[in-house]
């Protein structure tokens, strides 16, 4: 896509396998028009049809119109307000527990570490599951297996071609996928039933969804809740893990970045809580720059034109597909000078509009878990780096690989744990209670 952008500029088209062309808009003015257009101008849920095999047909990602509005309102409360403080305790405790088992000078794959942390956080936050329980271990294994099935173009080929989606038994790729998915669905339905029996004694996201009511006073069905929980698991685990791994990579790769971050962490008063940690300017800038240079997804969700609209002089007709390329927008030289360089300072020097910086998409389709994802990133990084120093092993060739929908670091990217000198340590940077 970078070649097409270099050749054709802000607006270019590609011929896809569909009947209508895909039109890419890289200019912030065009992006603003798309994100703020009348809701009836575009639909997006139908273009995500391939995701139904993972998240189910009731997922917010697959909805449009009034149904999308209803689901989004029902799902918003767990990701805002005072809930964040409770998540802070959870994130800190899980991260502290994981890194307490580290061995000095012993190399390890960093992506595996961040996957472990993010999966434990999401399972605890969503289901209230303790890692010692059987349900936790079953969910962990099933999630890992299903994510592996979409981790590369080769392994996920069957999703794109109908003739490959044939169940020839448990040893065939599609048959194995279907059985793993069914196991996961049954396990989640069982957790929903357990949560119903336990009533108000829980504080996880599942319990909040059971209590949620729309404007007519109706609750979500078990199938709707199941599919939304699946969406949270798939959208919130691998994406955060990849972003964390990239952040740790850049912090060590550019020594001045790590030095500035440590200096900032050292200024934290001993009585600070988790929310105060997440407001640190340079820590925030590091997370923002990480998501700029390697965004969670290459493109925002495609939008299918439903009625004629003109975008920067380009006439779109019904059936055409408008795409906002996040990666290309984040690498515009006129917005981000030296876009291939990791420079957190750019986020301290100016504020970017939501049409220039859009790691979580935009408009009505913006990711509802964006605040949670950033909150988790900041707390995990602060917890780790206030106590330990992580160094990349030398002579590694690091380049992004596809992992589901994300641009992840390679699985073999390895780091080593080194103890901090006494003057480098931050004394109790995050409290264990909000």
Outline where the language-model segments fall:
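Cytochrome P450 heme-thiolate "Cys pocket" and heme-binding signature region
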Residues: 70, 230, 235, 274-275, ...
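C-terminal domain-closing interface element
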Residues: 169-173, 283-299, 303, 410-434
């Amino acid at each position: 896509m970078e070649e097409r952008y270099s050749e054709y500029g802000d607006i270019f088209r590609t011929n896809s396998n569909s009947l209508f062309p895909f039109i890419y808009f890289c200019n912030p003015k065009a992006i603003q028009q798309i994100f703020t257009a009348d809701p009836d101008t575009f639909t997006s849920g139908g273009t995500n049809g391939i995701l139904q095999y993972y998240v189910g047909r009731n997922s917010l990602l697959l909805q449009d119109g009034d149904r999308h509005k209803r689901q989004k309102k029902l799902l918003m409360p767990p990701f805002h307000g005072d809930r964040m403080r409770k998540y802070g305790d959870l994130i800190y405790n899980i991260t502290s527990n994981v890194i307490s088992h580290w061995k000095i000078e012993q190399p390890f794959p960093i992506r595996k570490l961040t996957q472990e942390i993010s999966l434990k956080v999401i399972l605890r936050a969503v289901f209230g599951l303790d890692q010692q329980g059987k349900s936790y271990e079953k969910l962990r294994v099933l999630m890992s297996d299903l994510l592996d099935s979409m981790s590369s173009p080769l392994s996920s080929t069957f999703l794109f071609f109908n003739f490959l989606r044939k169940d020839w038994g448990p040893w065939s790729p599609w048959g194995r996928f279907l059985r793993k998915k069914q196991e996961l669905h049954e396990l989640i339905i069982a957790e929903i039933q357990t949560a119903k029996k336990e009533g108000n004694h829980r504080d996880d996201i599942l319990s909040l969804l059971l209590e949620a009511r729309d404007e007519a006073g109706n609750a979500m069905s078990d199938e709707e809740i199941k599919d939304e929980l699946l969406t949270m698991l798939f959208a919130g685990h691998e994406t955060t893990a990849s972003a964390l791994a990239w952040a740790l990579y850049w912090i060590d790769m550019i020594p001045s970045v790590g030095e500035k971050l440590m200096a900032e962490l050292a200024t934290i008063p001993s009585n600070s809580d988790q929310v105060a940690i997440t407001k640190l300017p340079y820590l925030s800038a590091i997370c923002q720059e990480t998501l700029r240079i390697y965004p969670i997804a290459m493109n925002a969700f495609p939008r299918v034109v439903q009625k004629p609209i003109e975008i920067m002089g380009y006439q779109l007709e019904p059936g055409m597909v408008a795409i906002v390329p996040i990666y290309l927008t984040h690498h515009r030289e006129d917005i981000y000078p030296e876009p291939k360089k990791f420079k957190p300072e750019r986020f301290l020097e100016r504020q970017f509009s939501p049409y220039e910086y859009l790691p979580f998409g935009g408009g009505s389709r913006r990711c509802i878990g964006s605040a949670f994802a950033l909150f988790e990133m900041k707390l995990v990084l602060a917890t780790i780096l206030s106590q330990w120093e992580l160094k990349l092993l030398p002579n590694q060739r690091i380049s992004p690989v596809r992992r589901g929908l994300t641009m992840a670091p390679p699985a073999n990217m390895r780091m080593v744990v080194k103890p901090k000198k006494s003057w480098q340590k931050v004394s109790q940077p995050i409290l264990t209670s909000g």
